[in-house]
C-alpha cells in the first residue's frame, strides 16, 4: 500500500528563523522544529499494554501525538535542498523536497503561515490517490486525472 507523500516546499521569512528551519530540514527534524513534541511522550513500541500504560499515566505516545499534530507518523525524510538560502529584499528564502508518511503536514504549514512565513508547497501521494497545493494557509487537494498520476 502506498505510504509516502512527496513534497516540494518553498519558504520565505525572517533570515534568522529561516536559518533555523534550514538546519532542521537538513537534520530531518523540520516538523519538530515548528511544532515541537512534548518531552514526556512515550517513545517505545505501541502494543495494547503500552497504550493502556500511557492512558493510566495520562501521557500521550509518539504515534498518536504526531498523527494529531503533524498528520504523519514521522518527521520529514530524505530532504533534498532545491534552493540554498538566499536573500531576496529583506527576507531569506529556500526550498526543498522531502517525503512524509501518509499525508502532507498541513498543520505544520499552517503554523509557519501563522508565524509570518511565506509558504508554498506542492504534494502528491506516491500511489496517485491525491495531489495538492498549499499556499499561505490555503490547501487545495484533489484526485488527479489518470494522466496526472505519479
Question: What are the language-model segments listed below?
Answer:
Residues 1-150:
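Long, contiguous binding/interaction regions
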Amino acid at each position: 500500500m502506498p505510504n509516502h507523500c512527496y513534497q516540494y516546499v518553498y519558504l520565505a521569512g525572517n533570515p534568522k528563523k529561516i536559518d533555523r528551519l534550514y538546519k532542521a530540514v537538513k537534520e530531518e527534524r523540520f516538523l519538530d522544529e515548528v511544532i515541537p513534541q512534548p518531552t514526556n511522550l512515550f517513545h517505545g513500541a505501541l502494543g495494547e499494554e503500552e497504550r493502556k500504560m500511557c492512558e493510566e499515566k495520562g501521557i500521550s505516545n509518539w504515534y498518536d501525538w504526531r498523527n494529531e499534530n503533524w498528520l504523519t507518523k514521522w518527521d520529514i525524510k530524505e530532504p533534498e535542498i532545491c534552493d540554498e538560502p538566499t536573500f531576496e529584499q529583506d527576507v531569506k528564502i529556500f526550498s526543498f523536497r522531502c517525503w512524509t508518511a501518509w499525508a502532507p503536514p498541513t498543520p505544520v504549514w499552517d503554523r509557519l503561515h501563522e508565524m509570518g512565513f511565506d509558504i508554498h508547497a506542492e504534494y502528491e501521494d506516491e500511489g496517485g490517490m491525491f495531489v495538492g497545493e498549499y499556499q499561505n494557509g490555503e490547501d487545495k487537494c484533489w484526485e488527479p486525472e489518470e494522466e496526472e498520476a505519479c
